[in-house]
From Swiss-Prot:
Residues 283-422, 452-590 form the SIS domain. Homodimer. Its main location: cytoplasm. This is Glutamine--fructose-6-phosphate aminotransferase [isomerizing]. The active site is at C2 (nucleophile), K595 (for fru-6p isomerization activity). Residues 2-217 form the Glutamine amidotransferase type-2 domain. GO terms for biological process: carbohydrate metabolic process; fructose 6-phosphate metabolic process; protein N-linked glycosylation; UDP-N-acetylglucosamine metabolic process. The gene is glmS. Gene3D superfamilies: Glucose-6-phosphate isomerase like protein, domain 1, Glutamine Phosphoribosylpyrophosphate, subunit 1, domain 1. Its EC number is 2.6.1.16.
Length: 600
């Protein structure tokens, strides 16, 4: 992990590669590097830390029109200059960048590379050294590349330079995202389209176990058997302005403010000309034919799934289970006879979720992906897709994708309810419109959120979020946002569980953020607040208008109670943002985190 770029053409490759890497910064990384074909061979530049440091060491006088680049998020070996990509073979003939994990790299070293002295701790160096070993047996570069890949077990997206064939880039993909971009007398390679929108909007999607030979005039796709594959390019539905901050200091703040527009966009996309919710009939029938829904997700998407369970069970009266993908893949529960799977992933590339999807596909079960990236791996491999229509989300901490997931899940639940003849009792599209209006109000109250962050979180070591019913799930997401970007030890708890152990953590001055948006548990959560105050906690109560009481810290505009999670999370996002600012943290690129987790 975490991002690859490549360029071959007539322009200066260095600047294109560096700008491409900068567009991949949102994915998270700890080091970066580029390699370029120069007059006297391949030149490698790499540094631990930010791309700005890498820029400082790149020689502007080196003329080159071919190169590859990489941002690394450490999986094998500590973050360091030595472990940063690109990696080279001993003779320096081959230079390689790689995303993914080679599971059998130690076995490959033992069987094929015992005489090689390795420079780094990475699994990636094994690939480039194996490439050189295969060529030494008399194979052509292409044959050696295919042989090398056939010996590897795991995931990879690879860009390879050959010093003896300077006018081409070799590319390969398996279980890790990679695109080839099409230009006029140039071509590019990228982990996602955003990296290369500066030069093209035409991309060719690569499938698993394919290799590509890229020159400035041609793109040749082959399978591992050497058979040529024809595939037309697609136009990326993005604009370069979509991935710029504009006047905002951070992408996260921009994306928080975009949430009302996202909700309105979702309403428009999922209703017919009469204003009625309309989903694909095939999705509806597949769910109606099932006897239980299983939601599979990670992180923020998992929290969205917990709320989605409430929507589906309350609206459509269908049983739902929600599972963390990384646990489900090796601890699968006993399934019902006719399960239906919903995979939630902002990027559509989450490796843990994909591992489960592969399993359930092999079992013959139908699956739906809810993702912000149609055409992503999960989208391609599932039977159905519901797009989020949220636009690119650049900040590592998810905000607008989360509320988009909630909106789409509510629409899905309402559609199934209607098909089953269940009475919803309210007009969902109208109520979602009111949610968007409430979001506008909340986004205009940044000064209040900043003040709360300063009062409760600027200097604290830890923080607890409590809630009952669906507020508990929103609290989990609030705690995740806070810990992600401010590095405060934050945890979410069910209010009723406090007395079963958690309350032992409360000490004098501990901030406790309590959510009170559900009428049927309002008195219960108020009692929990009294419990923690009695132990010295510093409470911050966020309530819904109509449920507020004297002493509440912030009152949310009223929306339909079922949709309260979509508005209750906005203050938590903003409080987390301002807490991170007060603590001088990197809001958009928090330490140790990657936006798209493409390895298990």
């Amino acid at each position: 992990m975490c991002g690859i770029v490549g360029f071959i053409g007539e322009q200066d490759a260095k600047e294109i590669l560096l700008k491409g890497l900068e567009k991949l910064e949102y994915r998270g990384y700890d080091s970066a590097g580029i390699a370029v074909q120069a007059e006297n061979g391949v030149v490698v530049y790499k540094e631990k830390g930010r791309i700005a440091k890498l820029r400082e060491i790149v020689d502007e006088n080196v003329a080159t029109s071919v190169g590859i680049g990489h941002t690394r998020w450490a999986t094998h070996g500590v973050p360091s200059k030595v472990n940063a990509h690109p990696h080279q073979s001993t003779s320096k003939r081959f230079t390689l960048v790689h995303n993914g994990v080679i599971e059998n790299y130690e076995l490959v070293k033992k069987e094929y590379l015992q005489d090689v002295t390795f420079v780094s701790e990475t699994d990636t160096e094994v690939i480039v050294q194996l490439m050189e070993q295969q060529v030494s047996t008399g194979l052509s570069v292409e044959e050696a590349f295919r042989n090398t890949l056939s010996l590897l077990h795991g995931s990879y997206a690879i860009g390879l330079l050959d010093a003896e064939n300077p006018n081409m880039i070799y590319v390969a993909k398996n279980k890790s995202p990679l695109l080839v971009g099409v230009g006029d007398n140039f071509n590019v390679v990228a982990s996602d389209a955003m990296a290369m929108l500066q030069v093209t909007d035409q991309f060719i999607e690569l499938m698993d176990k394919e290799i590509v030979i890229v020159t400035k005039e041609s793109i040749t796709i082959k399978n591992l058997q050497g058979e040529t594959i024809e595939r037309a390019p697609f136009t990326a539905e993005l604009d370069a302005s979509d991935i710029e901050k504009g006047t905002y200091p951070h992408f996260m703040l921009k994306e928080i403010d975009e949430q009302p527009l996202v909700i309105r966009n979702i309403i428009q996309k999922y209703q017919d000309e009469n204003g009625e919710i309309e989903l694909d009939q095939d999705i509806r029938n597949a769910i109606l034919d099932s006897d239980r829904i299983y939601i599979i997700a990670c992180g923020t998407s998992y929290h969205a799934g917990l709320v989605g369970k409430q929507f589906i069970e309350k609206f459509a009266k269908m049983p739902v289970e929600v599972h963390v993908a990384s646990e489900f893949s090796y601890n699968m529960p006993l399934l019902t006879e006719r399960p239906f799977f919903i995979y939630i992933s902002q990027s559509g590339e989450t490796a843990d979720s994909r591992a489960v999807l592969v399993q359930t596909n092999e079992m013959g079960h139908k699956a739906l992906t809810i993702t912000n990236v149609p055409g992503s791996t999960l989208s391609r491999e599932a039977d159905y897709t519901l797009p989020l229509y949220a636009g690119p989300e650049i900040a590592v901490a998810s905000t607008k994708a989360y509320t988009a997931q909630l909106a789409v899940l509510s629409i899905l639940a309402a559609d199934i309810a209607k098909a089953k003849g269940e009475v919803l009792g309210f007009d969902l599209t109208h109520e979602l419109g009111l949610v968007a209006n409430a979001m506008v109000q909340l986004c205009d109250q940044k000064e209040e959120m900043d003040a709360l962050a300063k009062q409760f979180l600027a200097t604290t070591r830890n923080c607890f979020f409590i809630g009952r019913s669906v507020d508990f799930y929103v609290g989990l997401e609030g705690a995740l946002k806070l810990k992600e970007i401010s590095y405060i030890q934050a945890e979410g708890f069910a209010g009723g569980e406090l007395k079963h152990g958690t309350i032992a953590l409360i000490e004098n001055g501990t901030p406790v953020i309590a959510l009170a948006t559900q009428e049927h548990v309002n008195l219960g959560i108020r009692g929990n607040v009294k419990e923690v105050v009695a132990r010295g906690a510093n409470p911050c109560i966020i309530s819904m208008k109509g449920l507020e009481m004297e002493g509440d810290s912030f009152v949310l505009p009223a929306v339909h109670e079922a949709l309260a999670p979509l508005v209750a999370v906005i203050p938590l996002q903003l409080i987390s943002y301002y807490a991170a600012l007060h603590r001088e943290c990197d809001v958009d690129k928090p330490r140790n985190l990657a936006k798209s987790v493409t390895v298990e």
